[in-house]
Structures are given as C-alpha cells and as structure tokens.
C-alpha cells in the first residue's frame, strides 16, 4: 500500500475550520511538555485544558471536545486519572488520542497502553519504535527516541489502525498517517524540531484537537501534521538554534498561512 502525498490545499481548508471551532482539548500529558503543549494549541487557535486529578478528569473529559493521553511521565496515580478520563470520553463519544511515549522500553506503560486500546482511541501518534512496540511487532527504543525510520513502521501502523479502527500516525523525517486502508505522507519540517523537547508531544495534542473536527478523520489528522511541519520549516529559517527556535515556532503556528506556503512551493 503506497502512501499518497497529503494535499496542502486541504490542510489550509482544515485549518480554517480548526480556528473557527477552537476545540477544547483536555491534555493529560507529561510534566516535561505541559507549557509547550498548551502554547502550541493556543498558537493554532485551540483551547487547551490541563486537568489531571482523577476526581476532575472524569467529568471534564465528558465535556471537552477532545482528549489527549500522553504517558511520558506516567505514575500509578496518573494512570488512574487517565483511565477515568478515557472511560468518560468513551462513554461520551469524545474522541481521544493516545501518545504511547517509550512504550517499548518500559513494561508498566506498555501494559497500560495496551489496556487502553480496548476503549477505542480515535488516533494514536508515536515514533516508529513506539508504533512497532504497540503493535506487538517489536520492543525496544531508547526511551522517547526512535531507533527505526518511520517508513519501517508503516506496515505495523496500518495493521494497528485496522485492528483498533482508528487513525495511526508514525512521525519522523516524513510523517505517515493511516486508517489501515488509505495512507498519507507528510514531508517537511526541520531537524531542529528534534533538538528541543516536546514537538512530538505537542503534535499529539494537535492531532487530538483535530479529531474533534467534522469530516474525514484521516484528512484532519494529516492536516495537523502538515501544520506542524510547515511551522517547523518557517521557524528554522528564522532562528539560530534550539533556544530561538521555540518562540519562532510558536509565532509560525500563530501566523500560519498554509495557502501562502503552498503557493511558495
């Protein structure tokens, strides 16, 4: 199954809808990236909420437009809160997205993520090693770092998407987005995106928010990847290194004009 190149014209159209809806996105993410994740969503026009207590997480997940579960700094108490939120989202038909950070390297989070799959995520976003591990095809990876190219994990992503009936995103130099039947590729970005903490985690939040949009989920999620790739390219051109990249990236998201970028390329 050969991937198709995602259309930037569609990404521009989707961004207009995203900004108009401003999806309320419940982010249960890791401690390292909370601020950057919230700022990424705000820059694009979404409304982030970082509700993590088990007592509050369950009811809030039911009223949010989307939920993100990121297991980067997972603890037993946080797993309890995440499970409560996912169950609530499932009952309320709120789309939720799983970011299985380092799932192949640590047994506790691997079992937790596998258990959550029965509650039908709308999307899963991970690097190649994480997707391979979650699909059961391989274990390993260096924590949050991947040891595989995204394309190598594409068959696993397609199989996982069919098994769970969801969208699976494998990120790398080229991102691949699949529903198991159709696959889209999104090139672009810049190596500087890998030299700061949180771009992948922030993408997962944007993917989660995009799942709240009407229309084809595959196209909406691929559009989310496209926005982040374009902003990364722009930010890299305007920065001198990781320290100046972060504010440039947030500015690029805020001013993102996919149609103009499409004309330039």
Swiss-Prot record:
Q: Which UniProt keywords apply?
A: ATP-binding, Kinase, Magnesium, Metal-binding, Nucleotide-binding, Thiamine biosynthesis, Transferase
UniProt-listed GO biological process terms: thiamine biosynthetic process; thiamine diphosphate biosynthetic process
Q: Where does ATP bind?
A: 125, 171
Q: Which cofactor does it need?
A: Mg(2+)
Functional pathway: Cofactor biosynthesis; thiamine diphosphate biosynthesis; 4-methyl-5-(2-phosphoethyl)-thiazole from 5-(2-hydroxyethyl)-4-methylthiazole: step 1/1
Under Enzyme Commission nomenclature, its number is 2.7.1.50
Catalysis performed (reactions): 5-(2-hydroxyethyl)-4-methylthiazole + ATP = 4-methyl-5-(2-phosphooxyethyl)-thiazole + ADP + H(+)
Q: Does the keyword ATP-binding apply?
A: yes
Against Pfam families, the record matches this protein to: HK
Q: Which InterPro entries match?
A: Hyethyz_kinase, Ribokinase-like
Which top EC class is given? Answer: transferase
Q: Which residues form the signal peptide?
A: none
Q: This protein's superkingdom?
A: Bacteria
List the GO molecular function terms: ATP binding; hydroxyethylthiazole kinase activity; magnesium ion binding
Q: Identify the residues that bind substrate.
A: 50, 198
Task: Give the UniProt family note.
Answer: Belongs to the Thz kinase family.
Q: Describe its function.
A: Catalyzes the phosphorylation of the hydroxyl group of 4-methyl-5-beta-hydroxyethylthiazole (THZ).
The protein's name is: Hydroxyethylthiazole kinase
Per the UniProt record, the lineage of the source organism begins with:
Bacteria, Pseudomonadati, Pseudomonadota, Gammaproteobacteria, Enterobacterales
Q: Which gene encodes it?
A: thiM
């Amino acid at each position: 199954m050969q991937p198709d190149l995602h259309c930037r014209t569609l990404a521009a159209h989707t961004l207009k809808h995203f900004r108009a809806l401003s999806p309320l996105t419940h982010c249960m993410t890791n401690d390292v990236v909370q601020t950057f994740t919230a700022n990424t969503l705000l820059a694009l026009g979404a409304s982030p909420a970082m509700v993590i207590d088990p007592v509050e997480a369950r009811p809030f997940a039911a009223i949010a437009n989307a939920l993100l579960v990121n297991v980067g700094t997972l603890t037993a108490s946080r797993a309890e809160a995440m499970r409560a939120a996912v169950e609530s989202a499932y009952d309320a038909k709120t789309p939720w997205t799983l970011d299985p950070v380092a799932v192949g390297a640590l047994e506790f989070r691997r079992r937790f993520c596998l258990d959550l799959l029965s509650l039908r995520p709308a999307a899963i976003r991970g690097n190649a090693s994480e997707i391979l591990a979650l699909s059961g095809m391989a274990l390993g990876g260096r924590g949050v770092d991947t040891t595989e190219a995204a394309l190598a994990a594409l068959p696993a992503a397609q199989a996982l998407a069919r098994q769970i009936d969801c969208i699976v995103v494998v990120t790398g130099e080229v991102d691949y987005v699949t529903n198991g039947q159709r696959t889209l590729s999104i090139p672009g970005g810049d190596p500087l995106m890998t030299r700061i903490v949180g771009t992948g985690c922030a993408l997962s939040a944007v993917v989660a928010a995009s799942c709240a949009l009407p229309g084809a989920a595959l196209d909406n999620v691929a559009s989310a990847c496209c926005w982040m790739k374009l902003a990364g390219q722009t930010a890299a051109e305007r920065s001198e290194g990781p320290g100046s990249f972060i504010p440039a990236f947030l500015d690029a998201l805020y001013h993102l004009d996919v149609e103009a970028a499409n004309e330039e390329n």
